[in-house]
Amino acid sequence: MAESWVIMVTAQTPINIAVIKYWGKRDETLILPINDSIRVSLDPDHLCTTTTVSVRPSFEQDRMWLNGKEISLLGGRFQSCLREIRSRARDLEDEKKGIVIKKMDWEKLHFHIASYNNFPTAAGLASSAAGLACFVFALAKLLTLQEDNGQLSAIARRGSGSACRSLYGGFVKWIMGKEENGSDSIAVQLADEKHWDDLVIVIAVVSARQKETSSTTGMQDSCKTSMLIQHRAKEVVPKRILQMEDAIEKRDFPSFARLACADSNQFHAVCLDTSPPIFYINDTSHKIISCVEKWNRSVGTPQVAYTFDAGPNAVLIARDRKIAALLLRRLLFHFPPHSNTDSNSYVIGDKSILQDVGVQDTKDIESLPPPPEIKDNIPAQKSNGDVSYFICTRPGRGPVLLPDSRALLNPETGLPK
């Protein structure tokens, strides 16, 4: 094999947000969960991971860059995925470049990987899930694996449990499985993103800082010390999974919202039941929950669902665009930006919803009237600056390959651009 060539693949995967939570493993090595879970993949136009994987004979070791900074690949998560994919590699022939890589050659070759998240990393927005899913998807394409996305999800699971659900768009279920080797613990798509395209999702980024207790550590502590987690896994989640599947199939928003809110609250109750207790949500998170609960109760039926993963950021799911505009009005009233904040950077993603809200700048936000449900109890002080920014998005597609023009690595050297 000539030393000068570089072969690259670039892919993009969505982040996913749980509506029935995964928390706790029965096998730490294989990353096998103690219960099924369901997530929604979000529109990668707004929230995604892009990853380029390259191979070249002269690469001396596997290297990875995340958001422009080199990180260690010595940890078990990436190495286990690499081993699994290398073992399944097939012959590759690139007629244009005159390159042939035999199956046995992949064991000797090293990879350069560059990954970029267009959202806060390690802040409760499932960044590791999207990153591992994109890594596995791109590497599998480069090594010409024949496995479908369901089979690839079992490999991605070895790196990050939630990653297996980012290999599909729309609504995705991670089956806990029963086999000791984890062969039946895979992701399946319940419905694609077009099935329920009325939904609009608003994410309140309360904090982009890295959380104090990682999900891995938190799960281990909960499984060791919480009595509630065992009751949840055995008695509560199996029923909720069936109910949530039914709600998604029928597009039954009131049931969907009640289940999502209840499961989020119970997940964080498990965190509080852990010793020492884990605090992923904060005072601002509580205020957002209160805002949604008051509105839902005043109308008599859920207009918005809320859910929080392992972090303070609120994921709010509105039943349609009209409700999403009313939601954003409420959020901007309660959580306005600092006076020197550019409104264009305060609401990102699908900014067209701002037109429905009637907001063009911070002065418009300052003049928003209080929501009717709090007219008799208007807060004396607004929570200026408690939310860093809002992201407006929707359910989205699964992973895709991107053209070489979108690559994060130099096609001549295989190093970051």
UniProtKB/Swiss-Prot annotation:
InterPro entries (alphabetical): GHMP_kinase_C_sf, Mev_decarb, Mev_diP_decarb, MVD-like_N, Mvd1_C, Ribosomal_Su5_D2-typ_SF, Ribsml_uS5_D2-typ_fold_subgr
Catalytic activity entry: (R)-5-diphosphomevalonate + ATP = isopentenyl diphosphate + ADP + phosphate + CO2
Gene3D superfamilies (alphabetical): 3.30.230.10, GHMP kinase, C-terminal domain
KW Oxidoreductase (keyword) present: no
Subcellular location(s) per record: Peroxisome
GO MF annotation, one: ATP binding
Main location: other
Annotated keywords: ATP-binding, Isoprene biosynthesis, Lipid biosynthesis, Lipid metabolism, Lyase, Nucleotide-binding, Peroxisome, Steroid biosynthesis, Steroid metabolism, Sterol biosynthesis, Sterol metabolism
EC identifiers of the protein: 4.1.1.33
Annotated GO biological process: isopentenyl diphosphate biosynthetic process, mevalonate pathway; sterol biosynthetic process
UniProt entry tagged with the keyword RNA-binding: no
GO cellular component assignments: cytosol; peroxisome
Pathway the protein contributes to: Isoprenoid biosynthesis; isopentenyl diphosphate biosynthesis via mevalonate pathway; isopentenyl diphosphate from (R)-mevalonate: step 3/3
Protein task: Performs the first committed step in the biosynthesis of isoprene-containing compounds such as sterols and terpenoids. Component of the triterpene saponins (e.g. ginsenosides or panaxosides) and phytosterols biosynthetic pathways. Catalyzes the conversion of mevalonate diphosphate to isopentenyl diphosphate (IPP).
UniProt protein name: Diphosphomevalonate decarboxylase 1
Organism (species): Panax ginseng (Korean ginseng)
Gene: MVD1
